Regions:
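Short beta-strand-to-turn element immediately C-terminal to the catalytic PLP-Schiff-base lysine
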Residues: 36-37, 50-55, 109
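PLP-dependent aminotransferase class I/II
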Residues: 1, 15, 19, 55-216
Length: 216
């Protein structure tokens, strides 16, 4: 069957409810794999890098092999005659060098312990932002479903159409006040590579374009 991969780059620490049960994003109860990003802008970081979670032992072993050049040291890969020392290894398929360094892993482990407090603090800030910004009719603050407990990796405002100052003016005005706003994300089909290679053009995905034009 088709394997389902969850993009958990922004979701670490978040939970959701399904049929009355609470699940953590990345526990792979409804997917085969979940990928995490530990880029410096994420909730926790290893400087750079990421992780994959799965409950499938075959997928786990495949990932283990792929991240270290395809090298496999499990006993069943060798005959008794071949297996004469612990230095033996086999390479059944080619892989890559996707391993974190010890320093990166140590940083990530220490950051992971701080995740509950990081999430609590971010949710506290979001609550304050929502209270202060919801008074402006031109802005729509983030909505959280009762079935979700978000880590709020991003605080996304919708700039409603008809606002006196457009999004660009609002963006640059915030910059002048020493805030650091950002727009997430440019629709993929509007980027040059996808236009050239797949023939996409503006207007192909109007909902994505509208969300982009109104997001801050």
């Amino acid at each position: 069957g088709i394997k389902v991969v969850e993009d958990g780059a922004h979701s670490i620490g978040s939970t959701y409810k399904y049929k009355g049960e609470t699940y953590k994003c990345g526990d792979c109860q409804h997917v085969d794999l979940c990928t995490y990003s530990f880029h410096p802008v994420k909730h926790i970081t290893t400087g750079e890098g990421g992780a994959v979670t799965t409950n499938d032992s075959d997928l786990f072993q495949r990932i283990q092999n792929l991240c270290k050049h395809g090298i496999d040291r499990r006993d069943h890969m060798f005959s008794d005659k071949e297996r004469r020392g612990s230095w033996y290894y086999e390479m059944d398929s080619l892989g890559f060098n996707y391993r974190l360094t010890d320093f990166q892993a140590a940083l990530g482990s220490s950051q992971l312990k701080k995740l509950p407090e990081i999430k609590r603090r971010r949710r506290e800030i979001v609550k304050y932002y929502n209270q202060e910004l919801s008074q402006y009719e031109e802005l729509q603050v983030p909505f959280e479903s009762p079935s979700v407990d978000s880590n709020f990796h991003l605080y996304l405002l919708r700039v409603r159409p008809g606002m006196k100052a457009d999004r660009y003016d609002l963006f640059t005005g915030l910059q002048r006040l020493n805030y650091r706003p950002m727009v997430h994300y440019i629709p993929i089909h509007l980027l040059g590579y996808y236009k050239r290679n797949f023939g996409y053009k503006q207007g192909d995905f109007p909902v994505a374009e509208k969300c982009y034009q109104e997001s801050l």
